């Protein structure tokens, strides 16, 4: 076939679809006319329940139509669809395309065309279409029944039109001269595969053979215009590599010079940094907050180039200077989230969320004791206020005690009942004291005695006791809070 088979198949399908679209609505109208005739016959014979049976008998008579009735139906389709000019040619084009496609030979014999075209007419195809569509209607007569809901009736119309389209396609296939096509297909020789001796003008055989027999050869090395390529021999390349000398490092590279070129390990630089940091840390009042921030930023610019180990060592020195007990801190250098220029540092109470003050003498210790007395059995020490009660409570050196109607009010806003206390005088902690002296006030009850050891300025504001001689105090029996934990001593 000179024409592409795929393209020819598309042409055949387009012609066939066009013919089906033209004939489908008018074939459907013809079938409805046959159903209407069946309803009239049922009304005349007073057999309304036999409408579908009468309709099936009329469909069976389609094959017996005379030529005049077939011609009348053909003329009706041409005139109604306004296809009288090309309907005959469209039918011949559909038949011819099917014959050529099925025979796989465009040069079909003239005998088949002449004999078939002389006997083929449009009326014959339309008659065959009615016969095939009548068979589908005979098998499904209820689709034409009018005594149903409008929705069901419309659905039945769509189904009938689909059956008509399939019936027209079958009619075209059955009207083809299939016997003559098979003979032409079987008798005539067909070249399904191309002849190897036949040359293609686009790809000559000589060029194809040369490409197969001759291996692919790379072209000569590309050369730039006016700059010929120089091929270096391996021996010359090795000799040229020997000219390079190893790089001599005169001074070992390390972390001595970093950042902005400041030698952080120089003694004068270290002394300068330490002096500035200590001035900022130890100063009580440097100035306003912007001045403090500016001073810190100047220090930060100097030590940005320092190594982590050097910063850690330097931070340890500054931390030990500020904190004699060397407590753990979140930021040793103190650039962020730390309070500068304060000799008193606040530590959060682990239980009551309060704060204790650390004096300037480095006595950052919190004296406290957790005492419990069950059934007048109490644990006491030199700094414990012992009271008779039924519940266990914790006392600290920051608690302000009062006695109102034999009830004690503590700093955690809880009232404890003291049934045997005879005195209401207690000592109050002086939080603003910076002295290193201690004051002891003794309050006696019937069964117990209480004694507080609090940092004070030497005066007892609320208590009845006087000054205490520090030499008489047993400091070994006092429990201290270390590493944020409470240790208890029981006598």
Swiss-Prot record:
Cysteines engaged in disulfide bonds, as pairs: none
UniProt entry keywords in alphabetical sequence: Virion
Polar residues bias locations: 355-364, 390-404, 429-444
Stretches the record annotates as Disordered: 355-444
Protein origin, superkingdom: Viruses
Pfam families in the record: DUF5764
Biased composition (Low complexity): 370-381, 405-421
Compartment annotation: Virion
Annotated InterPro entries: DUF5764
GO cellular component: virion component
Protein name: Uncharacterized protein L417
Organism whose genome encodes this protein: Acanthamoeba polyphaga mimivirus (APMV)
